[in-house]
Amino acid sequence: MTHDYIVKALAFDGEIRAYAALTTETVQEAQTRHYTWPTASAAMGRTMTATAMMGAMLKGDQKLTVTVDGQGPIGRIIADANAKGEVRAYVDHPQTHFPLNEQGKLDVRRAVGTNGSIIVVKDVGMKDYFSGASPIVSGELGEDFTYYYATSEQTPSSVGLGVLVNPDNTIKAAGGFIIQVMPGAKDETISKLEKAISEMTPVSKLIEQGLTPEGLLNEILGEDHVQILEKMPVQFECNCSHEKFLNAIKGLGEAEIQNMIKEDHGAEAVCHFCGNKYKYTEEELNVLLESLA
């Protein structure tokens, strides 16, 4: 059980909806599994944090997949999450790292690139999917998710994401927030929010200082204005299994399976999301062939 969690809140009498997350241990689990280098860890961790909070907006068995592809050296960052606080992610090139940028921070923009898009696919059940996309405008990811909400979901939002990495590549702190303006919000409320966000300390610094998700929202919105509705745990969780990969092998067709038996006398599958390996014996593949006959 991790100490990570997300809070859902309202502020300014329901004019603002807010989510904040602590994801240090969750991102650490992904870093350990994929052996990401610091810049890749920051990019993956920011994407995981945003995806976990987007998952918290879903209901029941709904889930979503986020693909960040800025055509940069890191390749694609793929994360998915559900409404239960379970999130997983991987990057195409985990050993991506660059010198710090001019601000002395991890150069996420350089790793991600700025020539692609963020694609969000929500599985809302009953074989019904919602898909949205927006161009990458910054490469730092917080601004890119902000832009996604404004253009794809027509929800004025502010997304802040932060990941700090220790010298030994472990994750020192990770977390973030999504603050959304609800229809009918007063101009005065929006102005207060914009001012608070423009003046705030960077998210990763606030988490490093030990601020909880509740503390993060209080810092931005003011303690008197925030009403916490719910708190839910967040963790790295992968739903891969021996059976799921066996079904995937079945989908390759008879000729390919016969080839595996003849050439390799079995098969091995590796999960992109968690790195788990699954081995399939010649006998298992023969049984699979019989089921296709």
From Swiss-Prot:
Pfam family, one: HSP33
InterPro entries: Heat_shock_Hsp33, Heat_shock_Hsp33_C, Heat_shock_Hsp33_N
CDD domains according to UniProt: Hsp33
Biological processes annotated in GO: protein refolding
Post-translational modification: Under oxidizing conditions two disulfide bonds are formed involving the reactive cysteines. Under reducing conditions zinc is bound to the reactive cysteines and the protein is inactive.
Location of the protein in the cell: Cytoplasm
GO cellular component, one term: cytoplasm
Keywords from the UniProt entry: Chaperone, Cytoplasm, Disulfide bond, Redox-active center, Zinc
GO MF annotation list: protein folding chaperone; unfolded protein binding
Gene3D superfamilies from the UniProt entry: Hsp33 domain, HSP33 redox switch-like
Disulfide bonds: 238-240, 271-274
Role description: Redox regulated molecular chaperone. Protects both thermally unfolding and oxidatively damaged proteins from irreversible aggregation. Plays an important role in the bacterial defense system toward oxidative stress.
PANTHER family: 33 KDA CHAPERONIN
Family statement drawn from the similarity comment of this UniProt entry: Belongs to the HSP33 family.
HAMAP family (alphabetical): HslO
Protein name per UniProt: 33 kDa chaperonin
